[in-house]
Amino acid sequence: MARTNPLEKVRNIGIAAHIDAGKTTTTERILFYSGIIHKIGEVHEGTAVTDWMDQERERGITITAAAISTSWKDYQINIIDTPGHVDFTIEVERSMRVLDGVIAVFCSVGGVQPQSETVWRQADRYKVPRIAFINKMDRTGANFYRVHEQMRDRLRANAIAIQLPIGSENDFKGIVDLVRKRAYIYNNDQGTDIQETDIPADLQNQVEEYYTKLVEAVAETDDALMTKYFDGEALTEEEIRSALRQGTIAGTIVPVLCGSAFKNKGVQLMLDAVVDYLPAPTEVPPIQGTLANGDTVERRADDNEPLAALAFKIMADPYGRLTFVRVYSGVLKKGSYVLNATKNKKERISRLVLMKADDRQDVEELRAGDLGAALGLKDTLTGDTITDEGSPVILESLFIPEPVISVAVEPKTKNDMDKLSKALQSLSEEDPTFRVNVDPETNQTVIAGMGELHLEILVDRMLREFKVEANVGAPQVAYRETIRKSVTNVEGKFIRQSGGKGQYGHVVINLEPGEPGTGFEFVSKIVGGVVPKEYIGPAEQGMKESCESGILAGYPLIDVKATLVHGSYHDVDSSEMAFKIAGSMALKEAVLKASPVLLEPMMKVEVEVPEDYIGNVIGDLISRRGQIESQSTEQGLAKVASKVPLATMFGYATDIRSKTQGRGIFTMEFSHYEEVPRSVAETIIAKSKGNA
């Protein structure tokens, strides 16, 4: 089957921003103007196409990344609408991994918010080119120029305006296109009556100022243009457009546009910018992967290359299990057998579909550069690579943040136990930041996630989609343990003699603090066979298992490096089990000697309140063991940035509402792990041992 769109005419883009910047409304308008929907859906009415889960339509927020294919001026545009709430960071993370370009949406009133910075960092991590759309220009307090400056200051982006607004708030009536030096006046709110005119006289000076900045920025991308610019020659529209494209794809320029998606102003011009400035799959660097022998290879966006696709999302569906994939090279065909290279398992593709939110169109194949969904993949999870059997390669997986909050769950009736475990398995397959485990001591099922809202929505989905009513315990903090000093030559010796064959395992280890984020690291420096090779693995396993259950208070031990330096064995009595126990004993002993400490998740908390309430809010954050990092005031609103332990932040949404008469808002996201103060740690440890 021939390709319907040449690869140069494909754009894989995401729409990302902070909560309430208007992402979903922007997506709806794109779909409307590109002809995929015939009636505009509104978030506040609960009719948006990309918000298709019940919880999304009720809450007016986007939770999962909905993938949609549409077209604009002979270009195929695959769009992912991502959530702005920090509890759903994994959805943004996984979409950034498979995109070639991003539209970053900013609110012209709220400006650059904490979540904007998070999304920006994620786009930086995957080097995704982006354009910015300053939305809601019709709102009271709208200020394009302030947000443009915030992008330059707070995001350190080379944000270059390629449009300027004509008026703002109620007087917002059009847009100046700086590249073409033309004005577009919107004569109605449906975006159907647009008049192209000369630039209004009262804007001439401002337009010249920003046009000069634009020309300077594009001249820096190309030596020939720089020479022409210094020689005083004017750059042509085509030269500016071409250099802007080059700079955007290289990540050195972020073109800034403006409009009001809700009032249908600026959306068509934004679609033109997607086509003009964001890259085709052929214009981004080839994806890199690893062969079985450890060598690195590249896979180019080409139908004739071997198949390489990344599974970036799993979704339970009434018709079967949907695996969303980005095809980087080759062709994925319906009915074909493929290899899950990550797990080395053969799988069969039964169906392939292109998505229009919760609607779908069956297709025979997905080609290089396509985003779609496959049915029939039973063992494939988020981050797995799908390849031809003859050309296996493993693509770089996703960065998956660790959960920071957990709650115990149990079904309301014993009969629902099976349904609960099926629901939890299905939900954890969909969402890698959602973890499920059973506490070995209490036998309770514990679920962990990225925040209170995250877990609340998952419990809600258990009821709606799996018909499981669950009792949920109080939230628990995901504490961790680590060590502060190094210790050497710590012994673990397990000997058991009770007639007949005995047990003998003996190891000697050094233990030292590891680099942050390394978890548990093991190195063997055994020489001369004092510990036979077949017993080194079990000794490591014993240490690893001890790390999982912790030493101080039963929390996982992280960022430690154990080195096996010596030991001994018995020809008859030694066994894998004996060395596993010896490894566990050595690690526990070493940790107790290495100044063990408790770590807690610290959250980045930003609060925005009317000035009158700021004193109360700061006092409250300090009483929660918070560290105030910055404070600013703008237009009667005060903003406070702080780092606060998660343990003290449960129920904060209710507290801040009551402290500010409902006028305060806040965002909270995980920042890092930090040592718990001794007095607090003693209470936590005593509680874990049942002494409190």
From Swiss-Prot:
Pfam families: EFG_C (PF00679), EFG_III (PF14492), EFG_IV (PF03764), GTP_EFTU (PF00009), GTP_EFTU_D2 (PF03144). CDD domains: EF-G, EFG_III, EFG_mtEFG1_IV, EFG_mtEFG_C, EFG_mtEFG_II. GO terms for cellular component: cytoplasm. One of its GO terms (molecular function) is GTPase activity. InterPro entries: EFG_II, EFG_III, EFG_III/V, EFG_IV, EFG_V, EFG_V-like, EFTu-like_2, G_TR_CS. GTP binds at residues 17-24, 81-85, 135-138. One of its GO terms (biological process) is ribosome disassembly. Gene3D superfamilies: 3.30.230.10, 3.30.70.240, Elongation Factor G (Translational Gtpase), domain 3 (3.30.70.870), P-loop containing nucleotide triphosphate hydrolases (3.40.50.300), Translation factors (2.40.30.10). Residues 8-282 form the tr-type G domain. It is found in: Cytoplasm. Keywords: Cytoplasm, Elongation factor, GTP-binding, Nucleotide-binding, Protein biosynthesis. Coiled coil: none annotated. NCBIfam families: EF-G (TIGR00484), PRK12740.1-3 (NF009379), PRK12740.1-5 (NF009381), small_GTP (TIGR00231). Belongs to the TRAFAC class translation factor GTPase superfamily. Classic translation factor GTPase family. EF-G/EF-2 subfamily. Catalyzes the GTP-dependent ribosomal translocation step during translation elongation. During this step, the ribosome changes from the pre-translocational (PRE) to the post-translocational (POST) state as the newly formed A-site-bound peptidyl-tRNA and P-site-bound deacylated tRNA move to the P and E sites, respectively. Catalyzes the coordinated movement of the two tRNA molecules, the mRNA and conformational changes in the ribosome. This is Elongation factor G. It comes from Trichormus variabilis (strain ATCC 29413 / PCC 7937) (Anabaena variabilis).
